[in-house]
Amino acid sequence: AVTPKLIQQLNGKFIQILTGARRTGKTVLLQRCVDHLLRQEHTPAKSIFYFNFDDLELRRELKSDPNLLLEAIALFSGKPLAAHSTPVYLFLDEVQKLPAYFDQLKLYYDTFRPKLRLMLSGSAALEIGSQAAETFAGRIQQTRLFPFSAKEVFHQHFTELQLPSVLSQLLEGRFDAEALRQLQADLLPLQSQLHAKLRQILVSGLLPQAYLAQNDTERMDYLRQYRITYLERDIRGLAQVGNWEDFSRLLNLLILQIGSFLNKTGLSQELGIAQNTVRKYISILEQTFLLEQIEPYTGHVRKNLVKSPKIFFFDSGFFGLVSGLTNYEVLVNSGKIGPIFENFCLNEIRKAMSLSAQFPEIHFWRTTGGAEVDFVIKTDSHLIPVEVKLSDSYGQSDLKNLLKFKATYPKKVDKMILIYNGPLQYSGNIVFLPIWFI
């Protein structure tokens, strides 16, 4: 579904930029867009051009001849870009390798739009984000890519299942409780298999190659190499990172604290580095999509509410790499499985929200008295409080904070969500939601 949406956006008025963490499929998606244009849209091959800036020779040639791309279009299509009567599609991968070329791309866009349709992608979000935002101001539309979603994995293994996004239905006002009850009845024979698959992905994470690894050793080797590549290629060369080893130690410490309140003073003291440096390094982790700070929701009631943000990581698999806890039973016995499940649910909510036209925000809610709701999804008109519980059952104590939140913001809250491992249910405006229905 992402590819047709991207093509629709590409045919709009903005330059499309694919962002996201390393190895989340940006190159693959570019190639799928090319294939979609050829097979589904029947776009002539001579109107589609793909260049990968990872090619050192290409970068050298572009530096010496900035108009090389226009010359290539003219050569292979048989006429210059200005003479085309139908759109020409230009896909450029790993564009962060040549940020000086952004000014040239801006010139192409301003000169040849709407004939030229331009899509860029790359791994180093810092260079792409800051440089593109400045160069292409008012001209770009960004799409963030994520690792696999749990729904994709469940669809892959249980191809006969229909697993709609209940969260999307709630956000778009088309929630149908009766239809979902029937779906749940169809799922009952597969509950144990679904639970087994969930246990696997909580440990492995959902980066494609980590999830598809044949065994724990292969998975850990991949994640270890991913971490090294991120630090060596994306971070080591950045002027903002004064001490590479301090950055690496902070990254490890933050991974072990997923789901916790961010305490920059404590991190500074534990690592022996200045608070300003901690703040700067955390900003880099956010801009490269590895780390996310979730801010508390305060609304109009600001007294007696916690103000510190909570930290989450983009994929749960790295917790095992850093902690050494590499299987589900060990994680359960360590007491760390709760924060990992919470982190996992946040990522799945993010993936579902990225497909929504509502552009919702996500927060958490906690009072100084200890009442807490794990997540609060905020749209223009509604709030949806979300509690997370790694269990196949629930009690009234699991609902009390949802109800307290609703009582605090009665005009904003209609539906509430409890994510857990039991069957899909709907009662008293609370949706009891298995992870595979997010």
Labelled PLM ranges:
Residues 102-119, 134:
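Conserved catalytic/switch belt of AAA+ P-loop NTPases
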Residues 1-13:
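Pre-Walker A adenine-sensing motif
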Residues 131-247, 251, 255:
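Interdomain motor-coupling "hinge/lid" segment immediately C-terminal to the ATP-binding subdomain
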Residues 51-85:
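Short glycine-rich substrate-engagement loop in P-loop NTPases that contacts/grips substrate
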Residues 18:
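Hydrophobic anchor at the beta1->P-loop junction of P-loop NTPases
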Residues 27:
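Walker A/P-loop
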Residues 49, 211-383:
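Accessory nucleic acid-recognition modules appended to NTPase machines
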Residues 421-438:
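Domain-level recognition of nuclease-like catalytic cores that cleave nucleotide substrates
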